[in-house]
Every structure is written in C-alpha cells, then in structure tokens.
Swiss-Prot record:
One of its GO terms (cellular component) is ribosome. Belongs to the eukaryotic ribosomal protein eL8 family. The gene is rpl7ae. Keywords: Cytoplasm, Ribonucleoprotein, Ribosomal protein, RNA-binding, rRNA-binding, tRNA processing. This is Large ribosomal subunit protein eL8. Part of the 50S ribosomal subunit. Probably part of the RNase P complex. PANTHER family: RIBOSOMAL PROTEIN L7AE FAMILY MEMBER. Multifunctional RNA-binding protein that recognizes the K-turn motif in ribosomal RNA, the RNA component of RNase P, box H/ACA, box C/D and box C'/D' sRNAs. One of its GO terms (biological process) is translation. It comes from Methanothermobacter thermautotrophicus (strain ATCC 29096 / DSM 1053 / JCM 10044 / NBRC 100330 / Delta H) (Methanobacterium thermoautotrophicum). Pfam families: Ribosomal_L7Ae.
Amino acid sequence: MAKAIYVKFDVPKELADKAAEALEIARETGKVSKGTNEVTKAVERGVAQLVLIAEDVEPAEIVAHLPLLAEEKEIPYIYIPTKDELGAAAGLNVGTASSAIVEAGDAEDLIKEIIEKVEELKK
C-alpha cells in the first residue's frame, strides 16, 4: 500500500507500539481526545501534548490537516499503523482516525521519550 499523503515520516513499529501504550496509560490516568474533530480542537487550543494519527485513513483528507496544524502549534505528532489499533488504545470498540493525549497522567515520562524519538525521525 502506498504511503498516505499526510504521512511525513516513517515510524518504527516499536515506537508506534510505545505511543499506543502511552495513549492507554493516559486514557486511564489522564485525559485523551478521540476522533478527528476533538483532536483538531485540542490542537487548535494548544492543549494536546501528543497527537496520534492512523496511517490507513480513507479518504486521507479527513486527517491531512493535522500534521500541518500540529507543526504550526508546535505540538508533536506520531503515526500509528491502523485505525483499529489506535481505536483500541483509545478505549474504543471501533477504529479512530486520530487521538490526542491532553493530560499525560502516569504516561508523562513515556511521552517525553516518544517526543524525543519523533524529533530525531523528522530530521
């Protein structure tokens, strides 16, 4: 499958798994936004700490604005391979195109580690 238009860098599987784990921890001990509308609002308001975007969103235009918006607001973002994987990590029974960690809770150190690795990938 060709890479979607909004995917700007490749994320190693281990790092994507760590990001999904951080989302699960934040969901239980902090606060997360689920769905592209909620995520867009969290980014626009500058309250998102980390944005997670699924790589298999169809049509791509649903989330194509998120990387640009996140960069503009200086909020780190990462890609997760599938909507189903992202939805499960967000505590949903269905897939989701995007999710954001708003309050890290116990995932704070893990999020810092992920952000450092994402910055290296973007270089």
